[in-house]
Swiss-Prot record:
Designated gene of the protein: rimP
UniProt family annotation: Belongs to the RimP family.
Domain of life (superkingdom): Bacteria
One Pfam family per UniProt: DUF150_C
Protein name per the record: Ribosome maturation factor RimP
Gene3D superfamilies: Ribosome maturation factor RimP, C-terminal domain, RimP-like superfamily, N-terminal
Cytoplasm keyword on record: yes
Keywords attached to this entry: Cytoplasm, Ribosome biogenesis
Length: 151
């Protein structure tokens, strides 16, 4: 299990117990200067007070469990309008929306793809790129995915 998966599994019961969806978790930066981002959401959206409540509970849990070596900053926020895509089900949930992908390696000559998300087809994400070409990108090649606000 990766460190991100471990963190997600550790945090999800606390976040859902508070009445929020744990959208995803990111751990960025180098050792000693890391940031743990915890994205939460509800159907009604997220307010500052929601982030504070989750931050307080998650911070206590992380202090006890100590799953991250060294110092780090904790950030709790809504996923925002340019929402990151963490879960396979979100590729169907946001079908029809504009998306941008960063790939782990070249796929059909590119590492970045922008276009309209067409959904998930088994282990492939379907995207109609800006040139109108439909791509089937293996899920395992996607490093990062976000909804795209740019027209």
């Amino acid at each position: 299990m990766s460190q991100i998966q471990t963190l997600h599994s550790l945090l999800e019961p606390t976040v859902t117990g508070l009445g929020y969806e744990l959208v995803g978790v990111e751990l960025t930066g180098a050792k000693g200067n890391r940031t743990l981002r915890v994205y939460i959401d509800t159907p009604a959206g997220i307010r500052l007070e929601d982030c504070e409540a989750v931050s307080h509970q998650v911070s206590g849990l992380l202090d006890v469990e100590d799953p991250i070596e060294g110092a780090y900053n904790l950030e709790v926020s809504s996923p925002g309008l340019d929402r990151p895509i963490f879960k396979s089900a979100d590729y169907d949930r946001f079908s029809g929306e504009r998306i941008k992908l960063r790939l782990l390696e070249l796929y059909e000559g590119r590492r970045r793809v922008k276009g309209v998300l067409l959904g998930l087809d088994g282990e492939f994400v379907r995207v109609r790129d800006v040139d109108g070409v439909e791509l089937r990108i293996p899920l395992e090649l996607i490093d990062r995915a976000r909804l795209d606000l740019e027209p």
